[in-house]
Curated annotation (Swiss-Prot):
Keywords recorded for this protein, A-Z: Aminoacyl-tRNA synthetase, ATP-binding, Ligase, Mitochondrion, Nucleotide-binding, Protein biosynthesis, Transit peptide
Short sequence motif named 'KMSKS' region, residue ranges: 649-653
Gene: IARS2
Protein name: Isoleucine--tRNA ligase, mitochondrial
GO biological process: isoleucyl-tRNA aminoacylation; mitochondrial translation
Amino acid sequence: MLGAWRAAPRLRLRARFGVASVWARSAASEANSRRPAEESRQDSQYRDTVLLPHSRFAAQLPGRLQPDTELETQQKSGFLELYSWQRQRKAKQEFCLHDGPPYANGDPHVGHALNKILKDITNRFHMMRGYKVHYVPGWDCHGLPIELKALSEVKGAENLSPVEIRQKAKEFAERAIEKQKAAFIRWGIMADWANCYRTFDPKYEANQLRVFHKMYDKGFIYQDYKPVFWSPSAKTALAEAELEYNEQHVSRSVYMKFPLLKSPPKLASVIDGSSPASVLVWTTQPWTVPANQAVCYMPDAEYSVVKCATTGEHLILAADRVESTAAVLDTQFEVISTCKGVDLADGSCAHPTIAGRVSPLLPANHVTMTKGTGLVHTAPAHGMEDYNVASHHQLPTECLVDESGHFTEAAGPELKNKNVLEEGNEAVIKMLQAAGSLLKEEKYVHSYPYDWRTKKPMIIRASKQWFVNTANVKATAQEALKKVKIIPTSAVNRMLEMLDRRTFWCISRQRCWGVPIPVFYQKDTGESLINSETIADVIKIVEQQGTDAWWTLPIEQLLSKEAVAKAGGHNVLDYVKGQDVLDIWFDSGTSWAHVLEGAEQRADVYLEGKDQLGGWFQSSLLTSVATRKKAPYKTLVVHGFTLGEKGEKMSKSIGNVVDPDVVINGGDDHTKDPPYGADVLRWWVAESNVFTEVLIGPVVLNAARDDINKLRNTLRFMLGNMAGFNPETDSIPPSEMYIVDQYMLHLLQDYGSKVTEAYKEYDYSKVVRLLQAFCSRNLSNFYFSIIKDRLYCEEEKDPKRRSCQTVLAEALDVVVRSFAPILPHLAEEVFQHLPYKKDSEGVFRTGWINASSGWKKPGIEEAIEGACAMRDSFLGSISGKNALEYEVIIVIEPGLLFELMEALQAEESSRVSQLNEIMMASQTTLLSEIPKETPADANIVKGNFLINLEGGDIREESSYQVIALPTTKAKCPRCRRYTSDSSSTPCPRCLKVIAGKGST
């Protein structure tokens, strides 16, 4: 039941305690008091006989020393060589964390730190557990932001050729990569730094085009003319993942009327031509009105024909919007008739600004009743739903806006060359007003898409682009995603919803810094030439020369005569190379094809921020499922964003931007920005709830530093008490240990198990909480406080001392390994200060926590926790006074609790028993019945303790009494316990130890 450690049960009643011998008072206590100077002299007399802790490991490192200490530790411990070492060792299992490539366009920031450190904690944990870790860092190197930044550094950039632009962009990306790489290494990130991947590497680009090739062959890639998100500021199409939304965008909304040309047949009796009649429409994008081709209604909704009190004309709008619209227009509506949306069929209107154009009334399911009038102006070139309606009804999709966001000549002289979001909008509103169609204009604040890089407003614009037909791969992707473990689970539905909304993916971009779409166009007809053979030919060239070849080589070397002939052409020179490049999400989304090894090419983990649910996670899934019908990952771990410590977005104007380099090395003014070192940054990451937004600032960093200093104090105590101890030769078997030492091993085993499980679940904040609780509650506050006497005052090689030293050695090893993935610098620093030669290879080359299952002893908690409950009662009864100045009597009724305490103290009274050590008293007496006489100055406390053994099969509640009274003994000048007969003479134990030292 309790294990072999427990003494045989003895339920006899002890003889009554000799009251006179213990409670005799005399004047001994007064005589024992000494002057401080005299006490100091006598203490110093025995100082050299006490085994005080000693270690060169600092309890706290001054901030100025922290960065250099970490760099020295990295060098001594071989941080840079660790990755290649673990790749070369024999390991049964492989663990692959595929690095989502950060964008190579700037300095490292705390978002990078959060992401890279989380990955490193994950990798180091798995490596220590015996896995062969595969982690190849990479960078996303193409795209508009890099191109624009590179060009901003060049005078006359507008005159550069595509080849020159590409060269400048590549050089810029390379510089950014070197900066970021140096920072990541400084943070202690373990990775294959010698073989990083970059999306501009020829082999990467070739593998990317191979994925494109397979998707094209399977029919997933096509060209079409339809509306896409368009960035006028960047002059290119963008995917939805490249948008960010401005919640405070101000649009110019208008209420306008479309005069009825043909009344819907079912409303002929109501709208008979006796009064002017129009449909009432609301839009936040007046500039799209010239492209209007129809007005849409919701078939199942109710609509009203109303008479306007101001003008007397008839207006049609949704019945649910009559009251609110009348209020906005500052008029009154008289409802003449109500009908269903389907009753509006076969009606048509006059275009409000273009004479002679007819806009039919058409049904559509995207019409909503929450705002506007329930009738939607439909411009197929500027809306996804509008385009679908137009396709269904064979309406034209004419785009009157050019790539820079200006009206084209086809829009008419009044609008030509005007910016649609600025003066173009104003011009259209004036045209509506001139035509008598404008009823109301007002500012409208709403969420609006912006280009994520230029930070300028987007528009939706029809253009000829290349697409991935995600509608055909979506169902398979959703099924594949259901087999993926996603942490936290709250991200599952969000990713599925984002995937469900995506019907197509625009993959073409009108820039030159990227991977070209391998397509050729007939000069005269514009007809595209692309097939399996032409793509394969381009891939061969790209693999050898890189994608620069697309711009530098003549078309004759890129397109074969055979391919032209097969397509029905006659001359290669009749064709031109396409000028579009692939979306950078397609670049990074095919990284699995280049980086992941083995036949399966599947990573164990992708770990990125929540913005990647619609970005890299999704693009990787779509490309992998389209070509292989499986996800490229087994687990997704999704973390939040970094914010200022008050929860606000970081901004230079606010002054709350945290620079990781300043965190580590300090700023110009160390009083304002002190150096913390990389481990503080790593602790901040680990202790945060990374599945929500992660806060950082001076208060957070100071708290992290203080937490590490507390941990250092705990480590220093253990290191300091290891002097002269060699675990290989001096360890005591658990069966021969003090029960409290066995109890600590039991707690160590439990701690190791819980920490391991927390790491497995990527719950690193739980690891930190477990670590702090174990070090503070179990070690510092409990175990260290009761074993100091054994450590300092017993003979150096006494088994009792060796017993707790054995536990300290095991605890140090378990604790250091448990936080090593989080604080690798501190972990290696501790191992470098071990006073014995143990694991000279360091922490990371010697495995994970080795907590023996033999340490687990169910039931042992009851003995120690029962004793601790009584100690708490005892300490509470003396109100913060020194427990060493008291003797304690514990009275327990016969039963399990009494048996457990007997295992800790076989004698009736003892100053050296295990129970007395826990009580921290001068002497402990254990009785099974209350003494007949109790001194008046005794403190008596009663309590109960519930014993729960064998998983609850054995339960017994026992009552106890704790009687505390001042001791009559003097303070020993050596051990400072009240166990001596005279304040000038050491206690019997200390005399024996001193005598032993003299004999040696």
